[in-house]
């Protein structure tokens, strides 16, 4: 079993404490066994749909789906995959807002297992620690790689960054298109969903919040 880092454990415990962890169970099978089982079941699902898996274009699709689920689009369900964090002591006494805009978001709607496509913006006021900018993108990617609802994802990101950075002063903005709306049902190709989560000074001070929103809503 892969080792889970202390940062990952702290984040997971914080999410559980707040009641915003993704509904998950601990798997009892090894990854290769789970891939084999998923492939077997997907083979039957595809047959029930009416597809002929003897066709060379389709015969490996169950295996491809199993690998994609376990190793790629749902890899964020395994905290062993949580990004390795190197926190840097804030020796320069950075006190201004640190903000990363337009982080690519590609996730999966947990209701229909179709794509959520959008952008994330994260900002924080450093206290004792800062982290490398790419780590912000990696944390967003980790939580995107699991079945999600946008509202919970936004809150998970807020709590994760607050936990790692050891500060409440964090803001998260998510703007996304949901293919469960775009590609099925109402088939609305124009609408998008925006969610926000604020902590600390972003929650308490309107001007700070406005400063953050002024850049993300351009």
Curated annotation (Swiss-Prot):
Its EC number is 3.5.4.16
User: Domain of life, per the record?
Assistant: Bacteria
In Gene Ontology terms, what is one molecular function of this protein?
Answer: GTP binding
Report the Pfam families cross-referenced here.
GTP_cyclohydroI
- What metabolic or biological pathway is this protein involved in? Cofactor biosynthesis; 7,8-dihydroneopterin triphosphate biosynthesis; 7,8-dihydroneopterin triphosphate from GTP: step 1/1
Q: Which reaction does it catalyse?
A: GTP + H2O = 7,8-dihydroneopterin 3'-triphosphate + formate + H(+)
Q: What PROSITE patterns does the annotation carry?
A: GTP_CYCLOHYDROL_1_1 (PS00859), GTP_CYCLOHYDROL_1_2 (PS00860)
**Keywords in UniProt for this one?**
GTP-binding, Hydrolase, Metal-binding, Nucleotide-binding, One-carbon metabolism, Zinc
What is one Gene Ontology biological process annotated in the Swiss-Prot or TrEMBL record? Answer: tetrahydrobiopterin biosynthetic process
Recorded GO cellular component terms are:
cytoplasm
The entry marks the following residues as binding Zn(2+), namely 109, 112, 180
Q: Does the keyword Signal apply?
A: no
Q: Which family does it belong to?
A: Belongs to the GTP cyclohydrolase I family.
SUBUNIT field:
Toroid-shaped homodecamer, composed of two pentamers of five dimers.
Entry's NCBIfam families? folE, PRK09347.1-1, PRK09347.1-3
| Designated name of the protein | GTP cyclohydrolase 1
- What is the primary gene name for this protein? folE
């Amino acid at each position: 079993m892969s080792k889970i880092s202390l940062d990952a454990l702290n984040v997971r415990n914080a999410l559980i404490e707040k009641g915003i962890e993704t509904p998950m169970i601990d798997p009892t099978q090894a990854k290769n066994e789970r891939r084999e089982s998923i492939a077997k079941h997907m083979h039957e699902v595809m047959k029930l749909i009416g597809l002929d898996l003897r066709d060379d274009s389709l015969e490996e699709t169950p295996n491809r789906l199993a690998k994609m689920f376990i190793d790629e689009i749902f890899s964020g369900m395994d905290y062993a995959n949580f990004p390795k964090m190197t926190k840097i002591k804030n020796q320069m006494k950075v006190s201004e807002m640190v903000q990363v805009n337009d982080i690519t978001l590609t996730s999966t709607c947990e209701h229909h297992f179709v794509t959520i496509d959008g952008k994330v913006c994260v900002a924080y006021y450093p206290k004792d620690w800062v982290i490398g900018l790419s780590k912000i993108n990696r944390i967003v990617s980790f939580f995107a790689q699991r079945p999600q609802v946008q509202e919970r994802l936004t809150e998970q990101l807020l709590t994760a960054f607050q936990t790692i950075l050891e500060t409440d002063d964090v803001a998260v903005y998510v703007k996304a298109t949901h293919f469960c709306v775009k590609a099925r049902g109402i088939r609305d190709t124009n609408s998008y969903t925006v969610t926000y989560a604020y902590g600390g000074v972003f929650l308490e001070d309107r001007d700070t919040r406005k400063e953050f929103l002024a850049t993300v809503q351009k």
